[in-house]
Amino acid sequence: MLENLNLSLFSLINATPDSAPWMISLAIFIAKDLITVVPLLAVVLWLWGLTAQRQLVIKIAIALAVSLFVSWTMGHLFPHDRPFVENIGYNFLHHAADDSFPSDHGTVIFTFALAFLCWHRLWSGSLLMVLAVVIAWSRVYLGVHWPLDMLGGLLAGMIGCLSAQIIWQAMGHKLYQRLQSWYRVCFALPIRKGWVRD
């Protein structure tokens, strides 16, 4: 039943040779490049953010570590070929023929969006969740993922954020103090110059 649903949704979303070239180009940009918002925003929040923003970055890092491990485990337990490997649909994005479930891109961006929903602001989390859905759509549209690959990424992200909250409650303050002290040593000159926040 799930396989039939997966195939039906894929057939509805997947681009075809008749799709507008500009749509395919836009989808390629979204699928490949928009994920860079994750490291860029994390760096900005740490270097110029207040204590709350830096703690958010640490929580996100923990959540990502857990969710990617969960994703890796799920992929080994439930291996699934990509659509183009099975000669289903149309592929418009070069990709290795490795397992597709769950999506690494989906795992990362959904974890990031869920983290902001849980620990930052509703508006920022909602905006990032829209971005996550758009990235998920683009990778199915281009034929490198199944819809359920993205659902798997969302599930991994939920587990990652829940685990990060538990870990933070147990040792978050000590972890923040340790990382903050390392940061002050490594970035002593930029901090002294006022280029980044202490």
Curated annotation (Swiss-Prot):
Subcellular localization(s) per the UniProt record: Cell inner membrane
Record topology, Periplasmic segments: 49-57, 144-149
EC number: 3.6.1.27
GO biological process, one term: regulation of cell shape
Keyword Transmembrane helix set for record: yes
Keyword terms, alphabetized: Antibiotic resistance, Cell inner membrane, Cell membrane, Cell shape, Cell wall biogenesis/degradation, Hydrolase, Membrane, Peptidoglycan synthesis, Transmembrane, Transmembrane helix
Membrane disposition: Multi-pass membrane protein
Signal peptide: none
A single GO molecular function term of this UniProt record: undecaprenyl-diphosphatase activity
Main location: membrane
Superkingdom of this protein's organism: Bacteria
GO cellular component, one term: plasma membrane
Regions crossing the membrane: 28-48, 58-78, 121-143, 150-172
Membrane side Cytoplasmic: residue ranges: 1-27, 79-120, 173-198
One Pfam family per UniProt: PAP2
Enzyme class: hydrolase
Catalytic activity of the protein: di-trans,octa-cis-undecaprenyl diphosphate + H2O = di-trans,octa-cis-undecaprenyl phosphate + phosphate + H(+)
Cited function: Overexpression leads to increased undecaprenyl diphosphatase activity and to increased resistance to bacitracin. May have a preferred substrate other than undecaprenyl diphosphate in vivo.
Family classification: Belongs to the BcrC/YbjG family.
Full protein name: Putative undecaprenyl-diphosphatase YbjG
Organism expressing this protein natively: Escherichia coli (strain K12)
